[in-house]
Amino acid sequence: MTIEQIAKIANTTLNDENSKVFTALKPQIESWLNSDLFMGGGSKKFSKLYPPLLNPEQIDYYSSDPALCWILNLPLPNTFDFIVFGSHAASLHSAVPAFMGICGVYNICFGRDTINPKQSQNFASQNTNRQNYIDIFKALLQTKQIKDKFGYKKCYLQLSDFLLDDDVAKFYALLPQKDALLVTRDPISALKAMCHVQNRPQFMLLGGELFGAGVNFSISAKDYFDKNLKYTNKFTNDKYKPKVASDKELFSDLPSINDEKIKWWLLDRAQSFHDGQVFALLKERLLRVKIKLTSDFVNAKETMRDLSEFFGFDYNESPLFCERVSDLKYFTPLKIYTNENMPFFDEINEPLSNSTEIDAQERMRISKEQAKSSIILHLSSVFDKRVYISKNRGKIASGEITEYFDGIEKHFVVFLENPTLRTQFLANQTLLNKAQKYILLASHDIYKKAQNEKTKHLKESDILDFLAKNTELRALCAAVFNVHLSFLREYKPEIIETFKHYNHFAKLCVNDEQIEFCDEYKIEREKMSKIGLDKLWL
C-alpha cells in the first residue's frame, strides 16, 4: 500500500506534513486498514467519508498529539455524553447552558464568543476547523477531572459556530456518534435579536485603556456600563479588537436595523443561520435527535424534565427555570478590583464619563497601578456555573462570599476570583466594608439598567417592515433561510408552520423575481457546493 493510496482512503490531499506521518506510520496504518475490524462491521461507527487510519480504541488519547490525530482522522475523544447544536440567537449561550448547569451538566463550547479577548484580535482570519478540533480535543481530555473536581454528572459538547472552510466536513465527521439536542428558533425572531445585540464591555476602551474588563472603587458600575454598554451599528473584521464607545459609526444608545448589519449576520464567517448545514454534515454521527424551540426555555421546568429523561441526567427542580438568563448576559460577571487605598467614586467630584480624556487616562493609570495589589471579586448572576460548584463542593472551593453582602439585588452572587484569598479578604474589615458598599450599589444599578435595556429591544415587526422595503436584502434572507431550515423542512415541517414571523416573511417573498445575489453570498454558496451542501437549496 502506497502513501498515495493511504491518502485516498483518508480522503485527503498529500502534502509535506501528512506524507511524513503516513510514511512513519505506514506499517501500523496498513495493518489497521487490512484488519477484519476495519473491513467488517466494526467500522460502521466510524466515518465513511473520513475513516480513521489507526484503530481509535487502541489510542491513548491522553498522551497523543491532537494535530497528529487530526491527520490520522481519529475521532475526538469520547469523553462527553451528548451534543447540543443550533444557530446564533437561539439561547445556546444563555438559557441552555444555565439550565443544564443547574442540573449538573457541564458544557464545552468553542466559538468566537468563548475565546480569550487578549488573543482574539485576529480571530476572524485565524480560526479554522482544524484548530477547533485541536482545541476541543484538549478540552475533552479535561472532562473527567472537571466532573470529579466540581461534582458535574454529565458533559455535553456545544456546536454553535459553523466555520465554512475546506475542513468543515472533516471536522463534523470526526465527532463520536452521540445523541443530540437541536435548539432552533423562528429565523425572523433570531434576526431581530441579532440586530439589537450589544457589544461586550470587555472589548471597549475606558479612559484610553483596556482596564482588564473590569472596574474598581473609583469607577461606579453605573458609570462603567452607561459609558461602555452600547448597541452595535455595524461589525468589522476586527470585531474583537478593543474600540472606543464614543465611535458613533460603530455604536449607539439604541438598536438599529440597516443593510450592512443584516448582511453581516447572514454572511458572517461563522454562518449565523446554519441548522440545515450542520445537520447535513453531522447526521451520520447522530444516534437520536431531540428538537426544542428557544421558546421552550421560557418557564422551562417541563422542558428540562423532558431533556433529563431523554439524555439521562438528573432533574433538579429550581425556580430559576422560570427566570430570563439573557437579561444579565452582557453585565456579568463583572470583575471588581478591590484595594482599600482606592478612593471611592462618590468621593471624586466628577464621574469618569464626564471627565476629560487626559483626566480619564490618568485615573485609569493610577487605578491600574493599585490593581496590581488588588483582590479581585466577581459580581455575577445566579446562573454562574460556580453556584452549582458551591452547592456540591462548598463555598470555599468555589470562592463564593455572597453571604457577606447583605441587601444586594437577589439575581446576583459574589465570588473571589482566587478562592485561596478568602481568609485574607474577609480579615481586612476596611476592604470588606468598601466592597460591601460598592457591590450593594452596583447590583441594584446594574439590574435597573438591565431592565431598562429590555425596553429598547426591537420587535419582529420592525424586521419585517424593513425587509418589506428592500427586495435585494429580502431575497438574500430567503436564500439563507431556505438552507438553514432544510432539515426541519424535510423531517419536521410542522415546526416551520409554528414560525409565525417567518411565514409572514415568506408571504412577502411570493412575487419576488430571481435577482443577482451579492458576491459574498456567491462565494459562500460555492464553498458549500464544494462539500456537497448544494442539495440543500430549493
Where are these regions (language model features)?
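PAPS-dependent sulfotransferases, especially Golgi type II membrane carbohydrate sulfotransferases
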Residues: 1-75, 314-538
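Phenylalanine-focused residue identity feature
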Residues: 22, 38, 46, 80-85, ...
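PAPS-dependent sulfotransferase catalytic domain
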Residues: 27, 38-319, 329-358, 363-394, 401
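Intrinsic low-complexity, intrinsically disordered segments enriched in polar/basic residues
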Residues: 106-109, 131, 238, 242, ...
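C-terminal or late-domain output modules
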Residues: 113-151, 169-181, 201, 211, ...
